[in-house]
From Swiss-Prot:
This is Uncharacterized lipoprotein lpp. Residues 26-129 are annotated as: Disordered. Disulfide bonds: none annotated. It comes from Mycoplasma mycoides subsp. mycoides SC (strain CCUG 32753 / NCTC 10114 / PG1). The keyword Cell membrane applies. It is found in: Cell membrane. Residues 1-24 form the signal peptide.
Length: 548
C-alpha cells in the first residue's frame, strides 16, 4: 500500500498535494473545536486524515507538506490564504471525525469565508456583543390576555380601555407573573395615544402600545400588543329605543362666545386635567401658569369672571344632556383633540350604565365623538393679531450686552474693521441670555377674554416677581394656548451698531422666535402627540440701547 501511495504522489501535480494539505489543516481545526476531545498538539503528531477504508496513514513526504501548510493555517483565527490553492477548483470539505461516522459535519471550517463560527478560541455559546439589545422583546407574544382579572373580564373592551387610561398598573402585574425576566430587566408602562381600536364584539383592544425602558441604560422600545379576554358584547340596533345611550348626549349647535373666544388647546387640556388631576401632576411645572393656576376663574389671567375652566362647566357649555337618561347613565371624557390653526376641538366620551341601573338599559357601554368648530385661531400671517407677543425691554438689553458674548462683537463693530455694520451672533449662550430676558405680553383686543394683570415671562424671575407661562414640563405652555418655547426657539440673531451725533452709539438687536402651533391626535394628552405638519408662528423682535 505504501508503494501505491508513493506512486500516487509522484504522479499527482503539486496543486493536488497542496489540496491534501489544506484538507488536513481543516480537519485539525475542526477537531480542536470539539469539546469532548483533547486538541492535538501541532508538533507532536501528523495531521488527522478522515478515515477511509482504502487509505492508510500518509508517508513522511506528505507529512512535511502538511506541516508547511500548518505554519499559517494552524494559528488560531488565521486569515492567511493558502497560496497554492486553485480558486477555480471546487473543494469538498472532509467529514469531521465523530463517534458516529454516518453524521458528517456540514459546517464550514477553518478560514472558509462562509464560516460564521467564533474565531480566536471563542466558544460557540459566548454572548455576541453585537446582539440586538431588545431581542428578548421581539420574542414576546403579541397578544396579552386579561382573562385572569375578574375586574376586566366583566367589562367590555371600550369600558376596559377607559379604566386602563386612568390606571395602567395592571400591565406590570401581568409581566411580573408571565415574563419575570422581562419584568426584572425593564420598566414597563402603557403608552395610550388614542389610536387604540376597541372591538366589543370580539372582546379585544388592538394597537395598544407598551413602553419597555431598560433599567440600566434607560434605552426604550415601544411595542404594539392586542389585549384580549374582555367581555364579548353582541350589539343590537337600538336607534328606536328612546333609552338609547346615543340619545343621552348631543352637542350644542351654538357655543357661547366666552368659550369659543379661547384657543381650543387650552380648553382640551383643562377638560382632561380637571377630570383626572392625578394623571397630569407629572406634567406640571411649579411657580408658573400651570393647571392649578387656570383651574378656577383667575382674574389675573381672564377678563371675563364667568370663565371657569373645569370639566363640569366646560361640558355644560359644549353639550346638551337628557336629564331623564342621566338617571340611567354616566359619562366621561376619555380623549380630546385640538387644532389651534383651524380653531377645532374634538371630544370622545364614554357612556356607561350607572351602578344602580341593571335592568332598563342595555349592558354595553357606548362611545360618542363630537367635533366643534369656531374656536379662536392662530393667525400665522399676521402675528400681531394674536393674543401672545414677546417683548425685550431696553433696560434688559442694555444690561445683557455687557456680557462678553456681546461686548466683544460690539467692540469689533465700533472699530470699523469689518465692512458691514451688523454681525450674526451664533453662540448658544447668547440664546440663553435672550431667553431669560424676554417678557410676555397678553393683549386681547378682539374678544377681551384673555388679559394679564401681572408681569409674565418665559423664565421665572423671583427678584422682579415675574411669573413664567411655561407651566408644562419640557418648556410647554397652557396659557394662552399650548406650545413649546425654549432656547432653540430663538433664531437669526443680528447685532447692529450706528454712530450717533453725540458721540454715542446706538446698538440694536434683531432676532426671531419660532413658536410651534400644534394640531393634536385624539388622546388623553398625558403625552405630547401631534398630527400632520407643525405650523410655525414667527415673532420678529427688535430692541436697542445707547452706549458710549
Amino acid at each position: 500500500m505504501k508503494k501505491a501511495t508513493k506512486l500516487l504522489l509522484s504522479i499527482l501535480p503539486i496543486s493536488s498535494i497542496s489540496f491534501l494539505s489544506v484538507v488536513s489543516c481543516s480537519t485539525r481545526n475542526s477537531n480542536a473545536k470539539q469539546p469532548d476531545k483533547k486538541p492535538e498538539k501541532p508538533n507532536e503528531k501528523g495531521p488527522i486524515i478522515p478515515k477511509n477504508p482504502d487509505n492508510k496513514k500518509p508517508t513522511n513526504n506528505n507529512n512535511n507538506s502538511n506541516n508547511n501548510s500548518n505554519s499559517n493555517n494552524n494559528k488560531p483565527g488565521s486569515t492567511v490564504p493558502n497560496e497554492n490553492k486553485d480558486p477555480s477548483k471546487s473543494e469538498e470539505t472532509p467529514e469531521k471525525p465523530e463517534r458516529d461516522p454516518k453524521k458528517p459535519d456540514k459546517q464550514p471550517q477553518g478560514d472558509d469565508p462562509n464560516n460564521h463560527q467564533p474565531h480566536n478560541n471563542q466558544h460557540a455559546d459566548q454572548p455576541n456583543i453585537n446582539k440586538d439589545e431588545f431581542a428578548d422583546l421581539d420574542k414576546l407574544p403579541k397578544e396579552i390576555s386579561f382573562e385572569r382579572f375578574d375586574f376586566y373580564t366583566s367589562k367590555d373592551a371600550t369600558t376596559a380601555l377607559s379604566h386602563l387610561r386612568t390606571d395602567g398598573s395592571v400591565i406590570k402585574i401581568i409581566f411580573s407573573n408571565t415574563h419575570r425576566n422581562i419584568f426584572g430587566k425593564y420598566n414597563i408602562n402603557l403608552e395610550l395615544d388614542g389610536n387604540e381600536k376597541e372591538d366589543v364584539k370580539k372582546g379585544l383592544i388592538d394597537k395598544v402600545k407598551v413602553k419597555f425602558t431598560n433599567k440600566k441604560d434607560k434605552k426604550s422600545k415601544i411595542i404594539e400588543f392586542t389585549f384580549t379576554g374582555f367581555k364579548v358584547i353582541q350589539k343590537s340596533p337600538d336607534k328606536e329605543n328612546k333609552n338609547s345611550k346615543k340619545n343621552y348626549i348631543k352637542k350644542k349647535e351654538k357655543i357661547d362666545n366666552k368659550l369659543t373666544g379661547l384657543y381650543p388647546s387650552l380648553v382640551a387640556y383643562m377638560i382632561m386635567y380637571t377630570q383626572e388631576p392625578k394623571n397630569y401632576k407629572n406634567l406640571m411645572q411649579k411657580d408658573s401658569i400651570n393647571f392649578e393656576e387656570l383651574e378656577n376663574n383667575n382674574p389675573n389671567l381672564f377678563a371675563d369672571p364667568e370663565i371657569n375652566l373645569n370639566v363640569v362647566a366646560l361640558k355644560d357649555l359644549l353639550l346638551e344632556y337628557n336629564r331623564e337618561l342621566g338617571k340611567l347613565y354616566k359619562d366621561k371624557v376619555i380623549a380630546v383633540s385640538y387644532d389651534d390653526v383651524n380653531g377645532k376641538l374634538g371630544l370622545k366620551l364614554l357612556i356607561e350604565n350607572r351602578e344602580e341601573n341593571d335592568t332598563i338599559a342595555s349592558k354595553y357601554s357606548e362611545t360618542l365623538e363630537f367635533d366643534f368648530v369656531g374656536f379662536r385661531k392662530i393667525d400665522l400671517k399676521n402675528p400681531n393679531k394674536n393674543v401672545l407677543s414677546l417683548l425685550f425691554p431696553q433696560n434688559n438689553f442694555k444690561d445683557m450686552i455687557k456680557n462678553n458674548v456681546f461686548k466683544k462683537k460690539i467692540e469689533v463693530l465700533k472699530s470699523g474693521k469689518q465692512k458691514e455694520d451688523m454681525v450674526l451672533v451664533k453662540e448658544e449662550y447668547a440664546k440663553q441670555l435672550i431667553f431669560k430676558n424676554l417678557l410676555v405680553q397678553i393683549i386681547d383686543n378682539e374678544n377681551n377674554l384673555y388679559r394679564s394683570t401681572q408681569t409674565l415671562s418665559l423664565q421665572n424671575n423671583k427678584k422682579d416677581n415675574y411669573t413664567s407661562i411655561l407651566g408644562l414640563a419640557g418648556g410647554g405652555t397652557l396659557y394662552p394656548f399650548h406650545t413649546i418655547i425654549n432656547n432653540n426657539s430663538i433664531k437669526n440673531i443680528y447685532l447692529m451698531i450706528n454712530k450717533e451725533k453725540n458721540k454715542k452709539y446706538k446698538v440694536a438687536i434683531n432676532f426671531e422666535v419660532d413658536i410651534p402651533i400644534f394640531a393634536s391626535t385624539t388622546s388623553d394628552l398625558t403625552f405630547h402627540a401631534t398630527s400632520g405638519d407643525t405650523n410655525i408662528l414667527k415673532l420678529d423682535i427688535t430692541t436697542n440701547a445707547l452706549i458710549d
